[in-house]
């Protein structure tokens, strides 16, 4: 079965082979895959710009992948309680 749209999200802090494998598998099952990169300027270990470039460069040969940025403004997990 081929889906019209798929979504795979994460902080990718850092991007690793498990993420890459799952994104490739998801993209092969979708006409369009949105990879949602969540980031927080307060908590991230690796700057969002680096992680964005890693994802972009890792999948630039796959035309059906689009990267979306999603900022998380909470300072820590207790802000969600």
PLM segments and residue spans:
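Nucleotidyltransferase catalytic core that binds NTPs
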Residues: 1-81
């Amino acid at each position: 079965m081929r889906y019209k749209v798929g979504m795979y999200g994460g902080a990718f802090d850092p991007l690793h082979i498990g993420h890459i494998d799952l994104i490739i598998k998801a993209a092969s099952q979708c006409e369009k895959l949105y990879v949602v990169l969540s980031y927080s300027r307060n908590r991230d270990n690796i700057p969002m710009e680096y992680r964005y470039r890693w994802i972009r460069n890792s999948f630039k040969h796959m035309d059906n992948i689009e990267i979306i940025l999603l900022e998380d403004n909470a300072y820590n997990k207790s802000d969600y309680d």
